[in-house]
């Protein structure tokens, strides 16, 4: 291929991008801009999937200004084409440069292939038609971006994701309590933004300890391949890049990095700020602290990022726990114009408290007090509420229920932070199991006592070493086997033998401890174990998780390091052994959270074997008796940990001082109850109602559940694999193994590894076995598989015999599939209104369309394959007839496409105008509606209608059918 600036090419893999212009060429790469879609692509010159567009004499072409002309001659100047053309509107003859060609372009390739004997099989034609039909359905589906997640269908998560994910530029604070799925909500919002074309470049900033958890969650749950950035990665990039001033953040689209790294490395911080991202996610946002006098460095960095990144998701489980000022400051990061003054914010929040109390009364179906009616009237001052209040006093229960809901909905719309803050609590969501704790105090072995004494003589604090005595002992003698005398090991063996039918998760502090425990359990009792730690690759961890999940022949116990288990959930197990205790309440909750998730159906039993009168026992007692963190979630745990840290450290270093410790535990418990009461009193019922989604969220979950059970997905996918040439083997338990073969129609099938992959269509099985690929309409393997078919040449032409004794032999039918589409920027999301839409015609020799009378599947059952040489001869014989039928089909399609495009314009205008009117109405009563959001939506409405007016149609595929008698 010879490239030159100004040449026009199309993408073979993304023909919806329209006609591209080469803007830059060098020895290694070619850059091409696609104006119709406002997209730029860079390809390797040696393997660019591009086709040169050159027209011939007699072809009709279109100028960018819209007028058409017929090519009479072609010339070449500096490798670019010059066309001598005659305009159809005024007959003028001019020279047209190829760079001036219209960016939207149609190719009538199917008939060209047909007349050059490039005739495909009939079953491939059927596959292509079904792929087009399913592609259209998926673009219009309200479940797109929600159903493909590997997770249970939790209504409040789906509600938040749908509500936020469909916004133009979402800027929200996700503040659900621990275990309610903030990461999942953020992932679903992100996925919808990616599907809509609004987020190509994403930066996730998290604490260092959560980097791998996010990496695994994004990959396993959403099939999003993020890159982990640290100093080593940045330096490696600098070493391999030829440019001196290179920015590593420009090298990937989906990036995860730690906040600590950006803070400690000014150069990386500057580089991150110089990069254009579309969406920012910040986890553990409560670490961002602010006051009118000063802000911490973490806050200042995130503030700089939020000023230049249009979409922002902040995640925290403790929105107001660390003070109203910091809570206000986090909201200020999302909308500085709305949250401009702290005192005004406090006054406004105080104003909403009586309203929240009134909502609670409405929910309880109790009569409203005069004060509550006044509070509602103050907020809904533009409405005449007297008829509604009278209706609440009537005896008509149905009318009362309707009025109550109307009032609640109106109050939610006007809530001060309902557009930017979402918070669900366990008390509001319900459905969680109990957590039952048991502490096992064991004697400290003399071997550990001696080791501690040796350490003490070396000047170290011996009590610190007693947190992990096995590590201390092993470091002193690498050949020693601490598991031969450690009573925790004997207790664990007995425990596992007594619960052979149960799956048990054991979490250790370090990977080495987990590995050595596996050796001990296998050698002493032959207990089947899987080991899971950070030194393993993701594939190795998948295998370990699968071995543990296997209910028939799998491991009884999974031995995991604390870091290794991040991002993994083992809800099929209900027994957790903490062989080592984590250092703080947040890490403890993360460990318990491996089992305590929404969807866990059994009570969780937590076991802590520890040494009596040791720092381990002190910490266990403080967690349990002070925080009650084993048996309840403790949202104020870290605040108490920081407040009580100095006293706790004293007792950890003096574990035998029991009298003072009992008083310390009592004071901690009192403080916990006090903070818990404050949090409960501060609960915003109005906010929780808006965050929960109510019945609408339940209906959304049910709709996905119904689609999960639809056999159409399974039938289409297996047919796709079969025709492409992917080998399929039943693997049992609702799963199949698919493997590439040397006879596939394509060199590579998207997402299919050389060694094959095991897939399932069952959500519950996918949750239990993370090594399986969970196939849905949203899965990249299926989306890319459909693209593979519809963007390539598979099934573009076909010829078949119609066995029907009622028709005269030799009756000619022409089945045509046209596609009406809009080649427009992805961010407009016009596929909501006009996705690539297949229109089927079935013409007889007179040009009559029989498609309505003869359905596709009905016709398919009567067709027989035709040998390729016979098909080629037949097409040559009837070519004049086919050309005449094609001309008649074009006339029919012109009117149908016009109607379809007009309907799409009306729908777009209605939907976008309705949303504009809603936002404008709300803005009058809710300051939280941003003006830039309204202005942006109006621009989208105008641009959408303009782009839809340019929509075009093309012949995608055709099938020649000749009748024959049985």
UniProtKB/Swiss-Prot annotation:
Going by the UniProt record, its keywords in alphabetical order are: Activator, ATP-binding, DNA-binding, Helicase, Hydrolase, Nucleotide-binding, Transcription, Transcription regulation
Per the database record, which ranges form the Helicase C-terminal domain?
488-642
**GO MF annotation, one:** ATP binding
Supply the EC number(s): 3.6.4.-
Q: What does this protein do?
A: Transcription regulator that activates transcription by stimulating RNA polymerase (RNAP) recycling in case of stress conditions such as supercoiled DNA or high salt concentrations. Probably acts by releasing the RNAP, when it is trapped or immobilized on tightly supercoiled DNA. Does not activate transcription on linear DNA. Probably not involved in DNA repair.
Please tell me where ATP binds in this chain. Answer: 176-183
Can you name this protein?
Answer: RNA polymerase-associated protein RapA
This protein's record includes keyword Nucleus: no
Task: State the organism named in the record.
Answer: Actinobacillus succinogenes (strain ATCC 55618 / DSM 22257 / CCUG 43843 / 130Z)
Record-linked Pfam families: Helicase_C (PF00271), RapA_C (PF12137), SNF2-rel_dom (PF00176), Tudor_1_RapA (PF18339), Tudor_RapA (PF18337)
The record's annotation in Gene3D superfamilies points to:
2.30.30.140, 2.30.30.930, 3.30.360.80, 6.10.140.1500, 6.10.140.2230, P-loop containing nucleotide triphosphate hydrolases, Tandem AAA-ATPase domain
Cite the HAMAP family for this sequence: Helicase_RapA (MF_01821)
- What processes in GO biological process is this protein linked to? regulation of DNA-templated transcription
